Design a protein with these regions (language model features):
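Active-/binding-site microenvironments in catalytic and ligand-binding cores
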Residues: 1-157
């Protein structure tokens, strides 16, 4: 829980529609069984990318997003959207920590007006590192989240 929302935080209804689609990088992190996800594991992320994270793991074996990595994605790479495979990636960490150290991934993304899409399924079916990704939310005011139909389109070439 947060006592205050980040200053300048937009709701999903306020964000420009192009925020929810575009070029995405698919980061399958099967090699990180039970380990933190660090910036060096995400070298293929370009500035402005939609980032899709997945792995074959579940439970305690899932890799997790380190708080510093979340802020690196949001503030240095300026990603457009974060998509998380669940199970596969543990992204909501430190939820019981006192503010402002709780939920670092959630804070990094929402504090920088970057939507989080989860739970994504079938990421392991993607065969290309870069795809076109579309995830349009319902246009519902005063909601932090809503249902989406997430679609990844691979290039036929």
């Amino acid at each position: 829980n947060w006592t205050e929302l980040p200053e300048g935080m937009l709701g999903i209804w306020d964000m420009p529609l192009p925020t929810y689609f575009g070029e995405a990088v698919v980061c399958m992190l099967d090699h990180l069984k039970g380990q933190p996800i660090l910036p060096q594991h995400l070298e293929n992320v370009r500035e402005g990318d939609i980032v899709l994270l997945g792995s074959k793991w579940s439970g305690e074996d899932q890799p997790w997003i380190e708080g510093d990595t979340a802020f690196w994605l949001a503030e240095e790479k300026k990603i457009k959207m974060l998509g998380v495979g669940v199970p596969g990636i543990s992204w909501e960490t430190n939820t019981d920590a006192p503010e402002p150290n709780n939920s670092p991934t959630h804070r990094a993304m929402t504090g920088n007006n970057i939507p989080i899409v989860y739970p994504l399924d079938n990421l392991q079916a993607l065969t290309q590192e870069r795809v076109f990704f579309l995830s349009l939310p319902l246009n519902v005011e005063s909601m932090e989240g809503t249902w989406v139909r997430a679609i990844a389109i691979e290039d036929k070439a």
